[in-house]
Amino acid sequence: MPRDGSFRGSALITHLHWDHVQGLPFFAPILAAGAELDVYGPAQETGTLAEAFHQFVCPPYFPVTIEELYGRISFHDIEDSDVELNGVKVRARTVPHVGSTNGYRVEMGGASVAYLSDHQMPQDGSHSVSDDVLELCDGADLVIHDAQFTKAEFAEKYYWGHCTVEYAVFVAQEAGAKRLALFHHDPAHDDEAMDQIVDAARQAAASTGLEEVVAAYEGLTLSFGG
């Protein structure tokens, strides 16, 4: 990405938990004068998306305020609506989690990707899915979905705002998606545990019509036919 001030881009924020927003003021392209970034995400019960970011990108939590960054950051509240960003169709819908949370569907060039990074499955362990979630994932070429817990882990942490690997497979199956990328891995899962989780997910998906199940990781590239 350019760091000479020519950067123009948009970012979709699902919610305001630290693991999803703390990188914003460290985003190198926006540290150059002339750069522009538009950030889209859900408004909060206590105020707008912009107000929420201004509360933590400032001293004493960060050395400077948003206004003191060299580039320009603009914030846009988006919830249960559809927008078009530079020719890319974006659909935002509310997803069950802890606090105001969006899921997104992105469509471009005949391909569709659904992104549900954090998704609270029914706390009783049942496999019902909200209409908004199914709408986002409907027939998607790729669903990137929360899959933090095994069944045993969920039994202890059912109220943490996440779901099991099996539930992620179920959502993709119910929506008629083609591919599933397991996401939001538990930090306690090492490589061996992740291999076992992916194997279990693939077995669960074997008779569902899903073409592929992978574990998302930094640098992963997936291609869509067309």
Language-model segments: residues:
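Fold-independent oxyanion-binding glycine-rich loops
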Residues: 78-79, 117-119, 146-147
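Active-site glycine-centered loops adjacent to acidic/histidine catalytic or metal-binding residues
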Residues: 15, 118, 184
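Binuclear metal-dependent hydrolase catalytic cores
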Residues: 1-114, 124, 133-134, 194-226
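Cap/insert and terminal regions of metallo-dependent hydrolase folds
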Residues: 122-212, 216-217
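Short, basic, glycine/proline-bearing loop/turn elements
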Residues: 113-120, 154
